[in-house]
UniProtKB/Swiss-Prot annotation:
PROSITE patterns: EPSP_SYNTHASE_1, EPSP_SYNTHASE_2, SHIKIMATE_KINASE. Its EC number is 4.2.3.4, 2.5.1.19, 2.7.1.71, 4.2.1.10. This is Pentafunctional AROM polypeptide. Residues 948-1165 are annotated as: Shikimate kinase. The AROM polypeptide catalyzes 5 consecutive enzymatic reactions in prechorismate polyaromatic amino acid biosynthesis. It comes from Mycosarcoma maydis. Residues 1-26 are annotated as: Disordered. 7-phospho-2-dehydro-3-deoxy-D-arabino-heptonate binds at residues 159, 175, 181, 191, 223-226, 287, 301-305, 308, 324, 393. Residues 434-895 are annotated as: EPSP synthase. It is found in: Cytoplasm. One of its GO terms (molecular function) is 3-dehydroquinate dehydratase activity.
């Protein structure tokens, strides 16, 4: 890169020479004009230029026709066409123009939609209609869309017309209007069709900017800041120092008596107008100069794309909600961070750029609330952005190029630089992983300067701001904390800030304590900056308030609103300052009103036991109090005295000497201070010491890795307590420490030789305890003096109690995160104890949750240098004190850092700790909307968690947490942990929890419960399912832990059970008594369970009864059925798999591009007011449906149809949903249809509507219908809270006025795609043309669609649209009480209609083989076709060989598929194009599937095998979840013939760990065992009696017989037959037996299963009059296997689930007759 740069020709970094020319007065118009040139194009800048434009064009570009094109918005606001026509007519008179001319005007629709081929054609057709000729001059009056579109029209119309740009937006003025680029959009991207066509003039009239919304002005300022950043440091300084004045030129306030054309001449132009025009002129000048040198963008011109590589990618995802300039603003910061990593761009430069962009209300991070509140923010992932960046005009092949800053006003190269993906990923990613380094032969020596001290920087800012003069602060920390402090002081008018030395020096012009309220009641937003918040609380009290003015509000982010400030508030209140808590007591936000004289002063008492910052806050402001302040510290030991001493020392430097009074009794210094009144006088220059807390991290790197590190500017003379860290912590741990007054050097011991130090008081250096903790974690050796209180080496850290109220509870954070690495800790009141381990025992691949705390992140990056695969989430939190820490860690300390995504969310807009985190640029500092805040009280909603995140179950005692949790754990193959069991094991409560409670009481129990919860979460972050005790939510600390876990780490599931059932169970329980009624306990806990959980699982009281397998009336036994299993266990497994995203039960092949065809999908709309009595009916109605629509708005507890709008009771909805869930396996579409949209839910009931939507989210519904009529913030909140649910964004128009091809419908579609995973638009047809219009709309949007579209017309005329709609067509059924919407059809009706209109061709199917005359296959498939209304036919094609008839059949155009049986299962392969891997493994094909293209033409024939699928499916359906999770699951296969290989394969795929194989001919079994893969783990038995030698629990749970029925017997004395001994079925957990023999259905094996079941029932005393709920052994006959494999064939051929009930009934009827 360096060589390339040096080889380039030097580029003069200036602007076009005309930029430097002074303005002139135009002789024609009298306006004051600045003139620039870009190539040959004059650019005129000024104010109120329409008269000037008219006179200039008539005099210099005479033409017969002037064509003015603008948009409807501008015309409506400014009457553009009228204004220009008037001035043209005036100009013609003024100029006495003799030539004939006309002015044609056209107003077009606004927005990007007009910038299309259709939009261009419309303009051109209009120009031809008006006989426009080649001498015409085209005027583009508008923003970028108008300029690009009209410019392209001018470029191509009659091969090119004269063209004038008159931009009216700031973005267009400084960007698109200059340079000659013109273009229109294509469905595949923006600006893909266009040309370079230089305008004849560009007229930049800044008066237009007053017509812009504030946001549009900011949007344009992004480009202004950008050009200054890459080219002109002087202009940049002007932009950052004069932002209020520049903004006021556009946003006001304006003088009431100002002339209407103010600014048109220099005499009337205000200072702010001149500043604005100056920065616009500067930006235009840069671009004009660059374009003049590089018109066609061969290199230099792409410098103006700074911020655009990443910014454009962000814009591609977030458009149109986020504007171009807003995305580029974020992109500039991210690209500057790339430059910092690659070329050392200073953090000062990034800080200046960040502050400057914020001054113009632009976002600077993806966590800005304007981004996070958008539904699309979930799609902003690293992979998505990198993929978009592949298509960028600056790229060279696959190499991505980014403009890299070297400093403010300069770039690394005079073109974009090549940047690798891993660097971009490193910058973009929210998390970081550190590559561990081990002992190196040549230990490196590193010298590393740390950033300026945060503590000193913040104090210096306050002191300098309150001073009477100017001070230059050097080495100040440029971070989030100091930025918000400067912003706050600026808003209070406390000081004016400037920058020198490239921003390294901050010049503070103090205002002598004369503060004022922020303009427009702006809140002072301090993020999570505790120091700034505490200092600012007293600073704002200096603002004088006569009692009539509003208070000043200081606020922060979520965590800042939890940090204590009560002691300081109490002290200020007692002194007369009025302070109100606006949210939680004792925390921000605060509304502060000073007195008439500001801060009163006098004697003040303050508790300083929590934070010394309270003391410093009052000390710093005390000189400006109305009375002399005497500050007395009360309440106990003062915390961090050294920081109080630091404040006093700094005050002395600024001219105020604080007197610490002596105790009259002892004569020793007391805790009382006298502060004289006065004004600070700043030193001319104040050098800020480097940060001692930050210095601990590089020094710790040296200590832990055995290397050497020197930190200059921190030594023994430091004011900071943390400077002691090296001598008092590292040296005793075995490091060599050399410390002078101004530097510290640490040399670490040999790797792994750190030692414990027993006891250390870190009260003087509390922030450094985190660094000490990670070092002590790998200190495996005892202290040098040999003293330790435990057998294991340990160190107890004391004096750090205040660390519990920092950015997080740091003591708990360190304990929890160290536990993940395998390090034990113990908490104490004033600190913690750490038990070290050998570094080689550290757990690998740990994900460290950083709690949005900079010190947690940096401390664990030290430990990660030895821990393989450690991932540090929220890496950006280091920006609080050391923004370039990750760069320095790699570039200076030599430890490689990579970017990774946090598991809790891949979105770059969502912090793992704060899903509602706001940035400093958010409006009034308010966080984005969250669903729970809006609609659901405090109930949480799901997230997309890691698939492996540990699940926690909570709920009332006896709700089923253990039972259901065990099922869930088995379904997910996870470890199940019962917290009650852990409690008993840890505390030896042999007689149960009741014993412990009786002995120690409930409070002691709750404390132990809290400790166990913390330990379980720390030790099992993934791969487990934990069931907690019912009372865990009684403790507030537990509730906070659970809520934080649910929001950031993993699912917390609330198990809900009917309270009456709970009471009944507890009546016989030995659990300790509550001491109060169970219902009272439930009422108290229920809200807590909701606010601590992210999902709810109903332990449905009827679930077990519903678990009985359904079957047709003529099926002899329920275990013979092919109908799908449902019930409690099935639903619990589905629920848990859905919550973690393992299997979301959603349709994966929804059609996106309707032009390409695809499988049509449908959902059945249920309209029952009570679904429970109709559950069996609903199952019979499911055939053909892909999902069920659950219409919550139509539910009614009375059981009567809903006739007027009403709100269904929430509990009723829950129970109805649970009942349906336990009776179907289909996905649920949860719908609440409002009355205006055609439903029965009252309009306007926002809270109740979203409460039901939240219910659906929490109950794991696969699809949720979300109406688009609600506010965007509400819709975004739902999308952010949807977890794994998919949103169907719906719009229903009942008026019949919806025009499918209108702009308004396009906007509805765009909005539906923005918020939904599926777009749903419903119109109403009155004519057939409405259906044709819909299909044209569908075809148009399909060209660029990324989301499936459900679009139909209601009404009988609209039925055609329902027939052809490919996605989730709502259908009804003849048995439904009424249709959910007019015109709904049944599935059969739709299929019949599709066939009639030629959209569903009739197909032919056949069975190949011999003999096949008695096969049930034709009956099976033809029954299915008829039941679903499909026009297909299945027949028999008998042959003993693969002949021409078979070949002709499979190659015929109407071939739909075929079944294959003996003798063709192998020979058929020669006719096939492909064979699946499964069929190859088994060595047989029994199914042929034709693959068709979008036109329906067969492109290939694929052979598959469904025999093994039938065996595996029926075995899995018959087994319990605990069977499938059994690590000793054993299977037995009898027979080694042709079907045995399919049976072995099926058991392997089932998850059987050991397969036993028996065959009467031993050699055949041994041969087969050798042929199959060794991972199948097949063992051959010489006799079935050998099973008796296995332990009972390792005996087979799955038995598959492949021998003829007549070949086996239960009689041990029979000769020549295989005897089936009872020992085969001795597993106490039972299982399933499958007999592949077709006849008879009641074989010896099935008889054996019946005998074992009978004996089992007798042994347990089953009441003969009561049907057992479940048999020990399920029995599956061969006929069931045949039907099951046939149903899988049916699905593969048709894409539809076979109607199993109808098929089963028909097949068994014929089968039993034949038997």
């Amino acid at each position: 890169m360096t060589s390339t740069a040096s080889a380039q020709q030097p580029v003069l970094r200036t602007k076009t020479p005309s930029y430097h020319a002074p303005p002139s007065t135009d002789p024609l118009s009298g306006a004051t004009i600045h003139t620039l040139r870009c190539l040959d194009t004059p650019i005129h800048l000024g104010y109120h230029l329409i008269p000037h434009i008219a006179k200039t064009l008539l005099s210099t570009l005479p033409s017969s026709t002037y064509v003015l094109i603008t948009d409807q918005n501008l015309e409506a606001r400014c009457s553009v066409t009228t204004a220009f026509r008037r001035e043209f007519e005036k100009a013609a008179v003024h100029l006495s123009s003799s030539h004939s001319w006309r002015l044609l005007t056209k107003v077009i629709p606004p927005g990007e939609a007009s910038k299309s081929r259709d939009g261009k054609n419309a303009i051109e057709d209009w120009m031809f209609e008006h006989r426009v000729t080649r001498d015409a001059v085209v005027l583009a009056v508008g923003g970028g869309v108008i300029g690009d579109l009209v410019g392209f029209v001018a470029a191509t119309f009659m091969r090119g017309l004269k063209f004038v740009q008159i931009p009216t937006t700031l973005l267009a003025m400084v960007d698109s209007a200059v340079g000659g680029k013109t273009a229109i959009d294509h469905p595949l991207g923006k600006n893909l069709i266009g040309s370079f066509h230089q305008p004849n003039y560009v007229f930049i009239d800044a008066a237009w900017l007053k017509t812009l919304p504030v946001r549009e002005f900011s949007n344009g300022m992004a480009e202004v800041v950008k050009t200054a950043a890459i080219w002109d440091p002087i202009d940049f300084a002007k932009l950052e120092s004069s932002a209020p004045a520049i903004r006021s030129a556009v946003l006001g306030p304006f003088a009431k008596d100002a002339p209407l054309d103010q600014g048109r001449t220099l005499e009337t132009r205000t200072e702010s107008q001149s500043l604005l025009l100056d920065v616009i002129r500067g930006s235009v000048g840069v671009k004009a100069h660059i374009v003049t040198i590089d018109e066609k963008e061969t290199g230099l011109r792409n410098l103006v794309n700074f911020g655009h590589t990443i910014g454009h990618a962000i814009e591609a995802v977030l458009t149109p909600e986020m504007l171009h300039g807003e995305c580029i603003s974020i992109g500039m910061i991210l690209e500057a961070e790339v430059a910092r990593y690659m070329h050392g761009l200073s953090q000062v430069a990034i800080g200046r750029l960040t502050r400057c962009l914020k001054e113009y209300d632009l976002p600077v991070s993806l966590s800005d609330s304007r981004v996070t509140r958008l539904a699309k923010s979930l799609d902003v992932t690293v992979d998505r952005l990198l993929d978009i960046m592949k298509v960028d005009k600056k790229n060279s092949g696959t190499n991505k190029k980014i403009v890299l800053l070297s400093s403010i006003g300069d770039t690394v190269q005079n073109m974009a630089s090549t940047v690798s993906d891993h660097i971009i990923r490193r910058v973009l990613s929210l998390a970081a992983t550190v590559t561990p380094i081990h002992e190196q032969p040549n230990k490196p020596k590193v010298t590393l300067s740390t950033p300026g001290s945060k503590s000193i920087s913040n104090r210096a800012l306050v002191l300098a701001a309150l001073a009477t003069n100017t001070c230059r602060l050097r080495n100040m920390l440029h971070s989030d904390d100091t930025q918000v402090m400067m912003a706050g002081l600026h808003d209070l008018q406390a000081a004016r800030f400037e920058f020198e030395d490239g921003g390294e020096t901050i010049v503070v012009h103090g205002n002598a304590g004369a503060l004022a309220r922020p303009a427009n009641d702006k809140q002072i937003y301090l993020q999570n900056a505790g120091t700034a918040a505490r200092f600012m609380a007293t600073v704002v009290s200096l603002v004088h308030n006569d009692g009539n003015q509003h208070p000043v509000v200081i606020t922060g982010n979520k965590r800042m609103k939890e940090r204590p400030i009560a002691a300081l508030v109490d002290a200020l209140r007692s002194n007369g300052t009025s302070i109100d808590y606006l949210e939680g007591h004792g925390c921000l936000p605060l509304a502060v009103k000073g007195t008439t004289h500001g801060f009163k002063g006098g004697k003040i008492q303050l508790s300083a036991t929590i934070s010394s910052q309270y003391v410093s806050s009052i000390l710093l402001c005390a000189p400006y109090a109305a009375e002399q302040v005497v500050l007395e510290l009360v309440g106990g030991q003062v915390i961090s005295q050294l920081y109080i001493d630091m404040t006093i020392a700094m005050m002395a430097t600024f001219g105020i000497k604080v007197e610490r009074l002596l105790d009259p009794t002892t004569g020793r210094p007391s805790n009382t201070y006298r502060i004289p009144k006065g004004h600070y006088v700043s030193p001319d220059v104040y050098d800020i010491e480097s940060d001692a807390s930050s210095a601990t991290y590089p020094l710790a790197i040296a200590a832990i890795t055995g290397t050497e590190c020197t930190v200059p500017n921190i030594g023994s003379a430091s004011l900071q307590g943390d400077a002691r860290f090296a001598k008092e912590v590292l040296e005793p741990m075995g490091c060599t420490v050399v410390q002078t007054a101004t530097s510290t050097t640490v040399i670490g011991p040999k790797l792994g030789q750190l030692r414990q130090i027993g006891l250390v008081d870190m009260e003087p250096m509390t922030d450094a305890f985190l660094t000490a903790s990670v070092l002590l974690a790998v200190a495996a050796h005892s202290p040098a003096n040999g003293s330790t209180s435990n057998a294991r080496p340990s160190t107890r850290i004391t004096g750090i109690a205040n660390q519990r109220v920092k950015e997080c509870n740091r003591i708990r954070a360190m304990m929890d995160e160290l536990a993940k690495f395998g390090v034990n800790t113990k908490e104490h009141d004033d600190g913690l104890e750490i038990f070290g381990i050998d570094y080689r025992q550290l757990h690998a691949n740990v994900r460290v949750h950083c709690y949005d705390d900079h010190r947690v992140a940096m401390a664990f990056s030290v430990l990660a240098s030895l821990a393989p695969g450690a991932i540090l989430e929220e890496k950006r939190c280091v920006e609080k004190t050391w923004p370039n820490w990750w760069d320095d860690l790699e570039r200076k300390l030599g430890i490689r850092v990579h970017g990774v995504d946090p598991e809790c969310s891949p979105s770059l807009c969502i912090s793992p700790s704060h899903f509602t985190k706001a940035s400093a640029a958010s409006t009034n500092g308010k966080p984005p909307t969250c669903l729970s805040q809006l609609t659901c009280g405090k109930a949480l909603t799901p997230r997309k968690y890691s698939k492996h995140a540990t699940i926690i179950c909570i709920g009332m005692r006896a709700s089923g947490k253990t039972f259901l949790g065990a099922i869930g754990a088995a379904a997910l193959s996870r470890t199940f942990i019962d917290a009650d069991v852990v409690f008993n094991e840890k505390l030896g409560a042999k007689d149960g929890l009741g014993d412990f409670v009786r002995e120690h009481g409930w409070p002691a129990f709750r404390q132990k419960e809290l400790e166990i919860l913390q330990e379980l979460i720390a030790r099992h972050p993934s791969g487990a399912l934990i069931s907690l005790g019912g009372g865990v939510v009684e403790t507030e600390a537990c509730r906070q832990i659970l809520a934080e876990y649910a929001q950031t780490k993993g699912p917390v599931i609330y198990i809900v059970r009917d309270t009456n059932a709970i009471v009944k169970f507890l009546a016989t329980s030995d659990r300790p008594a509550y001491g109060e009624p169970v219902m009272d306990v439930y009422r108290r806990r229920n809200p807590w369970f909701s606010e601590c959980s992210s999902a709810e699982l109903v332990s449905y009281s009827e679930g077990e009864s519903l678990a009985i397998q359904p079957c047709a009336m003529n099926v002899p036994d329920p275990s013979f059925t092919i109908q799908k299993k449902f019930g409690l266990e099935t639903e619990v497994a589905r629920f848990f798999k859905f919550v973690v995203g393992q299997d979301t039960n959603q349709i994966r092949d929804l059609v996106v591009d309707s032009r390409k065809g695809g499988r049509r999908t449908y959902f059945l709309s249920l309209t029952f007011p009570d679904v429970v009595p109709k559950l069996e009916l609903i199952r019979s109605m499911e055939s053909g449906s892909d999902a069920l629509e659950f219409r919550a708005d139509l539910l009614n507890p009375s059981g009567q149809p809903v006739t007027t709008p009403q709100i269904p009771p929430t509990e009723y909805v829950k129970n109805q949903l649970a009942a349906l869930r336990h009776r179907t396996s289909l996905p649920i579409v949860f719908t609440v249809r409002t009355h205006s949209q055609g439903g029965m839910f009252p309009d306007g009931k926002q809270h109740e509507y979203f409460e039901l939507i939240s219910l659906a989210l929490r109950h794991a519904c696969e699809y949720i219908d979300l109406e688009l009529g609600w506010d965007d913030d509400l819709l975004s909140a739902v999308v952010q809270a949807k977890g794994n649910s998919q949103i169907i964004a719906s719009w229903h128009d009942w008026s019949g006025r919806l025009d499918w091809e209108s702009e308004s419908t396009a906007k509805i579609y765009e909005k539906a795609c923005r918020f939904g995973d599926i777009a749903k638009i419903i119109g109403k047809a009155t004519t057939m043309e409405d259906n044709y219009s819909l299909e044209r709309f569908r075809a148009k949007v399909s060209a660029t669609a990324t989301k499936p579209l459900l679009a139909v017309n209601m009404g009988s005329v609209g039925q055609l649209s329902r027939i052809v709609n490919p996605v989730f067509t709502p259908i009804t059924h003849e048995a439904m009480p009424f249709k959910a919407a007019p015109g709904q059809l049944s599935f059969r009706q739709v299929q019949t209609a599709l066939s009639l209109i030629g959209q569903a061709d009739a197909r032919r199917f056949a069975l190949f083989g011999s003999p096949i005359g008695h096969s049930l296959s034709p009956l099976l498939h033809n029954t299915g076709f008829a039941a679903l209304g499909l026009p297909h036919q299945y027949e028999l094609l008998e042959s003993t060989e693969i002949n021409d008839a078979v070949a002709a059949f499979v190659r015929s155009p109407d071939f739909g598929g075929a079944s294959v049986t003996i003798p063709h299962k192998l020979n058929i392969i020669k006719l096939l194009d492909e064979v699946t891997d499964e069929a190859k493994t088994i060595g047989a094909v029994n199914t042929i599937i034709p693959i068709r293209d979008a036109q329906g033409v067969v492109t290939s024939l694929v052979g598959d095998n469904t025999d093994w699928i039938a065996i595996e499916t029926l075995a899995r359906r018959s087994l319990r979840t605990v069977h499938l999770a059994d690590p000793n699951l054993t299977g037995l296969v009898i027979g080694a013939g042709g079907s045995a290989r399919a049976a072995l394969f099926a058991l392997y795929r089932l998850g059987v760990k050991r397969i036993l194989l028996f065959n009467r001919t031993l050699a055949n079994a041994e041969k087969l065992a050798r042929e199959v893969p060794p991972e199948w783990n097949v063992s051959v038995l010489t006799s079935l009696d050998e099973v008796a030698q296995l332990s009972a629990d390792q005996s087979p749970s799955v038995v598959v017989s492949n021998i003829p029925a007549e070949g086996s017997t239960l009689d041990a004395s029979s000769r020549g037959l295989i005897h089936l001994p009872t020992c085969m079925l001795r597993n106490p957990a039972g299982g399933v037996v499958i007999d592949m023999s077709y006849k008879p259905h009641y074989t010896s094996l099935l008889q054996l299963a019946q005998q074992v079941n009978t004996n089992h029932e007798l042994a347990i005393g089953t009441n003969a009059t009561k049907a057992p709920t479940r048999k020990l052994w399920a029995a599956v006959p061969g006929i069931t296997i045949l039907l099951e494999q046939g149903c899988h064939q049916f699905h593969r051929w048709t894409g539809r689930e076979a109607p199993r009930a109808q098929i089963e009934a028909a097949a068994w009827d014929v089968y039993l007759q034949r038997c």
